[in-house]
């Protein structure tokens, strides 16, 4: 066996049809095959294609070059089929070997170590005359293989079959796949007359494996199965009889690819191959900057935006940009106030499905995260971490402009709108804009007159939940705001701030009722028109006791 027996060559057009994974697989297999042949002493010179591959050059050959694809002779077994037997190079004898096949068709297979290698056995439709057997040109079979088999996934255990520049004839399709492909796709290959999966056509005998074939005097690199066949069944699902019907079946969402590990079903075999990596743990796509690996190229593309800082998805309303389109969709719900995820038990609505899932744990009693200091329980570990900062006083999120610190990143994000002046939440009725969505929600209650927050003790209703919370302290007697210097407690935070001025000595000016209410001030001014206004000056404070104190609410 010489290196040319397993070598594959491409024209520039054919090389351009391969994706990155296929090219890498081709380089690796070709170099491994040459190393194997050289180790056996069967190769004395370094072929040009090997030199090109070692230099990192593109190994395609000019169109029209008579290249040896494989030392194979094609012989007719019966009037209805063609088969392969290894003998010699027939690349120049193709028109004579296949008189009913258009010139220019090249068929090649390069094997992958450890796999039951695929066959390129050309079979005509039984009973069809050469004139009726049309093989339209213009589209590479690579396209159809990617459509049906999901080739190009980078799986090293799948044999890569290349046929160009022809596409499958009308009513004829690629029916059988390699044993490895069937194992990956979760099904056993269906062969005519129920022959064994790895059967090799040998006159008078059928072998169940490559080892049996080699023991019988055959060669270990024989190929199996048939490629051009009459329409049959694909992976257990009823297969359409034409390519048009096949396309309709794909668009109709017919699921026929099942994972043998978890029984999940897919419409496309390429989706199944991607899914199988979740079971095998394979991550063939590696980031060149940080070395992190991914199972899909799309995940690698998204990850690389972290290094480049690229944010291609911009919000048309506020201009904020995101790395992922899904993040933009979630963000746009802020502007539309859309809350399409509603709890079936309490009716509470959420803008994100993940928030609804966490909320449902409340009804199910699922609050697994408990605070070690106060015992309060939470649905999420992140909520517990945020809560613990109320005990420790930690504020790790600092504003770079003014130095204000916050315990939560979302609070810092909202605070930064004070500096930017951004008000992305606009009222659709009056056009007034707000910096926070909660402010917009409260504002819209003015238009509707709704007071959704009702006290269970006295029945009084409020437009704001915070006002209801403060009101509830009247019934409970709770005073959570405690002065750190004297220990006096208050129901509301503003009352505590007023009280703390006693200790700091800060002077306050008592404001009249007219100063608090502009309408009352205007009425007072009208009634005293023409009379000298009586000026009231604040009485100098003789001590802390003279400072006015607000009454407790």
Curated annotation (Swiss-Prot):
GO molecular function: DNA-binding transcription factor activity, RNA polymerase II-specific; RNA polymerase II cis-regulatory region sequence-specific DNA binding; zinc ion binding
Induction summary: Induced at the early stage of T cell activation. Regulated at the transcriptional level during the cell cycle. Induced at a maximum level in the S phase.
Span of zinc fingers (C2H2-type): 257-279, 285-307, 313-335, 341-363, 369-391, 397-419, 425-447, 453-475, 481-503
InterPro entries: KRAB (IPR001909), KRAB_dom_sf (IPR036051), Znf_C2H2_sf (IPR036236), Znf_C2H2_type (IPR013087)
Protein name from the UniProt record: Zinc finger protein 324A
Biological process according to GO: cell population proliferation; G1/S transition of mitotic cell cycle; regulation of transcription by RNA polymerase II
The family this protein is said to belong to: Belongs to the krueppel C2H2-type zinc-finger protein family.
Principal place of residence: nucleus
GN (gene name): ZNF324
Positions of short motif Nuclear localization signal: 130-135
One GO cellular component term noted in the UniProt record for this chain: nucleus
Location of region: Disordered: 186-221, 502-553
Domain of life: Eukaryota
Protein's organism: Homo sapiens (Human)
Role: May be involved in transcriptional regulation. May be involved in regulation of cell proliferation.
Sorted UniProt keywords: DNA-binding, Metal-binding, Nucleus, Repeat, Transcription, Transcription regulation, Zinc, Zinc-finger
SUPFAM superfamilies: beta-beta-alpha zinc fingers, KRAB domain (Kruppel-associated box)
Localization per record: Nucleus
Record carries keyword Transcription: yes
Tissue occurrence: Expressed at high levels in the spleen, thymus, and PBMC, at low levels in the prostate, ovary, small intestine, colon (mucosal lining), placenta, lung, and pancreas, and very weakly expressed in the liver and kidney.
């Amino acid at each position: 066996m010489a290196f040319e027996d397993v070598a594959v060559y491409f024209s520039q057009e054919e090389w351009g049809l391969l994706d990155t994974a296929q090219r890498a697989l081709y380089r690796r297999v070709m170099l491994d095959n040459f190393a194997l042949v050289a180790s056996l002493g069967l190769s004395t010179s370094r072929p040009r294609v090997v030199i090109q591959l070692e230099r990192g050059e593109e190994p395609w050959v000019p169109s029209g070059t008579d290249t040896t694809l494989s030392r194979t002779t094609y012989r007719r077994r019966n009037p209805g089929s063609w088969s392969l037997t290894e003998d010699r190079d027939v690349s120049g004898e193709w028109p004579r070997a296949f008189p009913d096949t258009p010139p220019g068709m090249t068929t090649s297979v390069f094997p992958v170590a450890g796999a039951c290698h695929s066959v390129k056995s050309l079979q005509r439709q039984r009973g069809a005359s050469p004139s009726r057997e049309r093989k339209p040109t213009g589209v590479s079979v690579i396209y159809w293989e990617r459509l049906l088999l999901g080739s190009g996934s980078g799986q090293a255990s799948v044999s890569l079959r290349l046929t160009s520049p022809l596409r499958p004839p009308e009513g004829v399709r690629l029916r059988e796949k390699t044993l490895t492909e069937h194992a990956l796709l979760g099904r056993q290959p269906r062969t005519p007359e129920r022959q064994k999966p790895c059967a090799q056509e040998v006159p008078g005998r059928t072998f169940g494996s490559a080892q049996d074939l080699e023991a019988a005097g055959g060669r270990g690199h024989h190929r199996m199965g048939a490629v051009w066949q009459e329409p049959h069944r694909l992976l257990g699902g009823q297969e359409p009889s034409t390519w048009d019907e096949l396309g309709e079946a794909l668009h109709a969402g017919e699921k026929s690819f099942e994972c043998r590990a978890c029984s999940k079903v897919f419409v496309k075999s390429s989706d199944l191959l991607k899914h199988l990596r979740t079971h095998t743990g394979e991550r063939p796509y590696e980031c060149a900057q940080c070395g992190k690996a991914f199972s899909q190229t799309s995940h690698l593309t998204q990850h690389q935006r972290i290094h480049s800082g690229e944010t291609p998805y911009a919000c048309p309303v506020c201009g904020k940009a995101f790395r992922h389109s899904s993040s933009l969709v979630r963000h746009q719900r802020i502007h539309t106030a859309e809350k399409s995820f509603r709890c079936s038990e309490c009716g509470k609505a959420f803008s994100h499905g993940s928030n609804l899932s966490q909320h449902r744990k409340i009804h199910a009693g699922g609050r697994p995260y408990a605070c070690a200091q106060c015992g309060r329980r939470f649905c999420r570990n992140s909520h517990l971490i945020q809560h613990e900062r109320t005990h420790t006083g930690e504020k790790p999120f600092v504003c770079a402009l003014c130095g204000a610190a916050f315990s939560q990143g979302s609070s810092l994000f909202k605070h930064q709108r004070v500096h930017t002046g951004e008000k992305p939440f606009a009222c659709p009725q009056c056009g007034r804009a707000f910096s926070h969505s909660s402010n917009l929600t409260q504002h819209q209650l003015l238009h509707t007159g709704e007071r959704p927050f009702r006290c269970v003790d006295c029945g009084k209703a409020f437009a704001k939940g915070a006002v209801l919370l403060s009101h509830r302290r009247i019934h409970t007697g709770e005073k959570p705001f405690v002065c750190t210097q004297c220990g006096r407690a208050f129901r509301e935070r503003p009352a505590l701030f007023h009280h703390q001025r006693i200790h700091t000595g800060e002077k306050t000016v008592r404001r009249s009722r007219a100063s608090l209410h502009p309408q009352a001030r205007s009425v007072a001014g009208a009634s005293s028109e023409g009379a000298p206004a009586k000026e009231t000056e604040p009485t100098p404070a003789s001590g802390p006791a003279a400072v006015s104190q607000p009454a407790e609410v």
